[in-house]
Structures are given as structure tokens and as C-alpha cells.
């Protein structure tokens, strides 16, 4: 008896309609698309929607700067985004915009329901106001001198030089980024969503398995620090939706953005006849999944489910978060040419190369993925060209030339074929649980076995012998049967290569017929299925990216030069002399950061879990001001004093000291080791 068909709705986080799609965005959309395509192959009813996040002050101001309307700006962005996603074969059923009538309707309805249920509060707040532009200023649209280190040209919420945080009203000599005028303080009534009212519901939901363990643990920290009322309103002028029954008040972009998931699906329903309530009503038995980046976990794990609960809609089945993309072990960089836009990549490289590389490294955890350019070329050529496609290319010619394109009527090696088919459920499980790296590893292991079979049988030798036609046909047909199975497994990852393979094999690649051989089946003449990836293609992408951002990099470099002058680091005097025997008492070791997190209720401490090769240790380090995203340190190698006596702290036992350079506070830099080191190595 077959399993009942599942009803699934999948979304990706909404790209902001004020910039281009880059390879960081593509990680999420490729991850989701592979999962969606796999579910389609399994016969499930699945719908895949997304939209542009099209509201907010940045869009309004950028449009004004360009001399166009916000509507014109977001329409251009939407067209560009759709083209980029299509270029990477992202198979959305609908791509919409939050600036739509559907989103206006649902945003207003949800707000009214929350208000009717007592979850909307109001209070008067003080804000900086631009008297020339006649507008209240968000924190990032105010600049001035840092009240702590006196660095100039700093934003209204934090200093990029000393990392201090503060109120925009604490800035020295504040000015409006919009007009250059000196802002004044004005009061305004704002509306707040009563998030604390949902704490017990959220605690139960976050512990129900609806979040990855890493997210659930992080949410627990937020509970411990206390949930706050959430300001959901902004004052005019603002590009967005007006709040019902209010004057010159607009919904904050983060209120209507997730509702955009519902609006995009409603737009799809209206076009196709799908039933919206089947997927969104409170008692819906459909599955709802959000694929997001780790930077927006707070909104999707707290505000969004609380909004849905308070307005009597269903909550997500699960929220799948992923890490960031690094390039060659470092953050994407405009100056190094690694902040690669999707459109730049598509000019030079087959999108399936990136789909495969991301899949080969993606798992179900919130880990950053390193896009190593040298490994990228090697892996694509080794796995896809040399192994997978080569399996077909060195057998198909014999079938076409010697047997008029017809495959054999029996399997030459039934046991080997059965072994390949038997892996279908394990590979399916890996795709289902988003452990794509394990699926790829399993598929490539089978590919190696298939190539070994051909190597051992050597059809090119058989072809030269008299009276061996039946054997030659059987061996080559067997190789192509194994190729068909492998391409079926890889179809969610490499959809365009799968299309070409289907045209060549003259059959549809389906999950439910993997175990059905193509006996006495006619195939088309073999044509090249995939081209080698060359280093010169990578170089072209890097150089074009550098040229694209040359002016902005130049301006940023000049700005950083000013900041360094404003906050000159004093060189401390050399400490008193010690002997070699004194130094020898220190046992310095290389340690790998397994986990790094902020210590709740501490302004300074980070908790490290360190791998020293043969054991792990916990170390607390007062470098929080210098590393505001502690999870980004995970996977790095650091230097520690391993024989320092353990110190009991209120948060736990600290078993060593991590070394860093700098004057303290935000001016601290972890010492790291050169490539090639391993955890536990002694520093000499």
C-alpha cells in the first residue's frame, strides 16, 4: 500500500528589493529548490512560493536618489531577481511582491485581528526628526561622532570603530544622512505587538521539534533575557502600507514581510484554483516550511509564529535555517572580487556547477558553507565530468554504432543493479532530512562502482573480439542502466543535466521507476552532456566583480582610513624581561572552536567549546564586544594557554585562556594559526 500524498507549502526568505541577488542568496534558494524538486519526484503535492520584500525607508530614499518612484525601483528589482532565480533553475510556482493587494489585504486583516484580541498596544516614544525632509529618522539614517571613542561618521545605533552601542540621541553632532541637516527630538505615538503575551505558547512551540536544535537553544536564551514589546509602526513619509484607523502611520517592513508568504500563495491560489485555507487555516493538516538564513531566526521563531497564533492562523511545521557563504575561508568581499552577484556568475559559469557544489556541502545544521574556488573546479570536473557523464560517454557509442541504439533485453549483472536500486530509500532519507552532502557522497560512491564495473569489463576490448556482440551490448547496456539510476538520484540537484540525460535515454527519470530497466529500449545518439569547468571562468567572474564594485571599494577604503586616524591604537610598552625557563612553563596549544556563544546576562563573555585533539574544554573569554556574531568563530583554530589552572566562574568552569591581541573592548583580535594545523598541536 502506497503512502498517502503529502500537501506541502515551501517558502524562501524574501530578498530585499533594493539590491542584486548574490551567491549568498543562492545558497538558500538552491537548498530549498533541491528539496522541492525531490518532493515532486516522490509524488507529493508541493507548492513553492517567494516574493520580493518591497517596503521600507531604504527603498524610498534610494528611489528618490535615482529620481524614480519606489514602485519603479521595486518593479526593476523584481524583474532582475526573477531572471537570476530562473538562471539558476529555481522552480518557483509563484514569485510575487509584498507591495501587492493580496499583502495589503492580509496585513490589514491580521493587524485588525491582533488588535481585536488585545495584542496591540500604543505608547509615545521620542525619536530624531529631520526638519528639512519632515521625516522621522531610523537609527541607520543618523550619523555623528561616537560618544565613546569620538570616531566621526558613525551610525545612530552603534560605532563601527569601537563597537559601542548607544541611542541615536547620544551621538555628538548628529546629522541626517538624508538631508545633512541637524535632527531634532520629537515625540510620536507608536503601535506595539505584545510579544510577551505569547511566551508560554512560544516555549511550547519551540520545544516541539519545529526548530533545529541550534535555533531552539538560541530562542531559550532570548526567553531568559525576556521578551519585549515589538514596535510595528513607522511614521510618514514611509514606503509601505498605512495602518488602518490611524493617521500618517505605516506598518514596519518586518510586519508585512512574512505575511508576504501568505500573499504570494494567495496570488497562486487565485490563478490556479488552489484552496488557500487548506494550507493556512488553524487546523490545517498541510505542511508549511520556511527556508531562511540564520540572521533572521529571531523574526521567524518568535514574532512570526506569535503573529499567526494571535490572528488565528496555523504556525509553521518547521523553520529551516542555514549559515552564511564564505569564499576561500573569508567573508564575501567586494575588493577581492568574491562578493559575486548571481548575474555575474551566470555570464561565465553553468549554474548547475554551483547547485552541485552547494549540495555536496549542505547539511541539516546551521553551518557556514565555504565556497572554495579551487575545490569548486576540482569537484565539478571530477564528479560530474570525469565520473558521472563519462560513464555514459564511453558506453553509448557502442550501443549506437553496433546495435542501432537499442539496449539489451537482460541485465548483465543483476546483483549490481539491485545494489544500486536498494540505495534509493537511504538516498531519499538524506534528501528528506536536507543532508544533501550525505546523499551526494552515497551517489558518488555508487558512481565509482559503476565506473569500476566498466573498467573491469573493458567494452573497448570486447568490441575488437569476434563473436562477442551480445556481451558487448549487455555490458554497455548495463553501464547505461546504472547511469540512468544515478541521474534519477541527482535529478533534484542537476535538473538541466537530467533533462539532457532524459533526451539521450529517451525516457523520463522518475523515482518510482528507478528499479525498472529499459529492456530492448532505443536511445538517441550521445551528445556532450556537460562541459568542463575551467579556472579562466572563475578568474573572469572575480575580475568582473572587482570592476563592478571598484568605486564603492575606493570610497570604503577612504572611510576606513579616516576611522583608523580617529581611533589610533597606542603601542603599549614592552613588559619586563623574562627567562626562557619562565616562557617554557606555558603550554600553548592550537584549539579548534566547536561552539561559541554569548553568555546570557553577561556584557563581556563568550563561552567557547574547544577541541584539543584528544579532549574538549570549556573556556570563557571576555571578547564579546569584538565578536558580536560568536557563531561565526565556530570552525576556526585559535591559540590557548592549556596549562592555566581552571577558574570557577558563576557561569561555569573556565579551563584555559584564549589569546588575542589589542587594547581591549572592541579592539581585540583572536590569534589564529596557519593552514595545516590540527587541534591539540603545541605552539613552540
Swiss-Prot record:
Keywords: Aminoacyl-tRNA synthetase, ATP-binding, Cytoplasm, Ligase, Metal-binding, Nucleotide-binding, Protein biosynthesis, RNA-binding, tRNA-binding, Zinc. Coiled coil: none annotated. InterPro entries: aa-tRNA-synth_I_CS, Anticodon_Met, Met-tRNA-synth_bsu_C, Met-tRNA_ligase_1, Met-tRNA_synth, Methionyl/Leucyl_tRNA_Synth, MetRS_core, MetRS_Zn. It is an enzyme of class 6 (ligase). SUPFAM superfamilies: Anticodon-binding domain of a subclass of class I aminoacyl-tRNA synthetases, Methionyl-tRNA synthetase (MetRS), Zn-domain, Nucleic acid-binding proteins, Nucleotidylyl transferase. Binds 1 zinc ion per subunit. GO terms for biological process: methionyl-tRNA aminoacylation. Its cofactor is Zn(2+). A motif ('HIGH' region) lies at residues 15-25. It is found in: Cytoplasm. Residues 582-684 form the tRNA-binding domain. The gene is metG. Transmembrane segments: none annotated. Its EC number is 6.1.1.10. One of its GO terms (molecular function) is metal ion binding. A motif ('KMSKS' region) lies at residues 331-335. It comes from Glaesserella parasuis serovar 5 (strain SH0165). This is Methionine--tRNA ligase. Zn(2+) binds at residues 146, 149, 159, 162. PROSITE patterns: AA_TRNA_LIGASE_I, TRBD. One of its GO terms (cellular component) is cytosol.
